[in-house]
Amino acid sequence: MNTQPLRVGIGGPVGSGKTALTLALCQALRDRYNLAVVTNDIYTQEDAQFLVRNEALAPERIIGVETGGCPHTAIREDASINLEAVEQLNRRFPGLDLIIVESGGDNLSATFSPELSDLTIYVIDVSAGDKLPRKGGPGICKSDLLVINKIDLAPMVGASLEVMDRDARKMRGERPFVFSNQKVGQGLEEIISFIEKQGMLSAA
C-alpha cells in the first residue's frame, strides 16, 4: 500500500478539456484505485459541481478550491490552499492511491509546484489551431504528458494533426504526448497507462 497517494496535476487553457479528462479518469479508475479529486476555479466551484453532477466519484471525494485570483499562483507560487485540500482528503480517506489536482484554466506558462504534483498532464485542444504546440511554454514543453485534445475538430478549424505531431515532437524531445478525443474516449487508455506506469500504481 502506498504511504502517500500519487498526485497527478492536470493543467491547460480554459476549455481545453481538463474537466472532461478528469471525469473520464475517475470513471475508468474508481473501481481500481482509492481515488479523490481537487478542482480549482477562480470564484466558483463549477468544475467540482460538474464532477459531482456526473457522478465521477462520491461527493465527499471531490473538493472544489476557489482560488480567488490567478489560477497559476494557486498551483505554483502559493499552493497552500491546494496542499490543504490534499491533506484534508488524506485524512478523510486513509490509504488513498491517487489524487487528481485539476488546475483552473491557465495560460501556457503555468506549471505545478513539485510540492503539489508528482506527475503533470497538460491539455491543449486542436480548436486553438495547429500552431499551439510550437508556441511552447512550460506546460507544452515540460509536462510529463501532453494531451492534444478534441482532434475531431481538426477538419472544422483547418488544423493539421501532422503539423501538431511534428511540432510536439520538436518542442518536447523525448517526453510523450497523446492525441485524444474525450467525447468518445479516444486516447484515454494511453493516458491511463502512462499514469499507472510512471506513477507506479498497482490496482488493489
Swiss-Prot record:
Binding site for GTP: 12-19
Gene Ontology terms describing biological process: urea catabolic process
Superkingdom: Bacteria
Keywords: Chaperone, Cytoplasm, GTP-binding, Nickel insertion, Nucleotide-binding
InterPro entries: CobW/HypB/UreG_nucleotide-bd, P-loop_NTPase, UreG
Signal sequence interval, chain numbering: none
Subcellular location: Cytoplasm
One Pfam family, short name: cobW
GO cellular component: cytoplasm
GO MF term list: GTP binding; GTPase activity; nickel cation binding
Record keyword rRNA-binding present: no
Keyword Cytoplasm: yes
Gene3D superfamilies: P-loop containing nucleotide triphosphate hydrolases
Main location (coarse class): cytoplasm
Entry-linked HAMAP family: UreG
Physiological role: Facilitates the functional incorporation of the urease nickel metallocenter. This process requires GTP hydrolysis, probably effectuated by UreG.
Subunit structure: Homodimer. UreD, UreF and UreG form a complex that acts as a GTP-hydrolysis-dependent molecular chaperone, activating the urease apoprotein by helping to assemble the nickel containing metallocenter of UreC. The UreE protein probably delivers the nickel.
Family: Belongs to the SIMIBI class G3E GTPase family. UreG subfamily.
Full protein name: Urease accessory protein UreG
Originating organism: Stutzerimonas stutzeri (strain A1501)
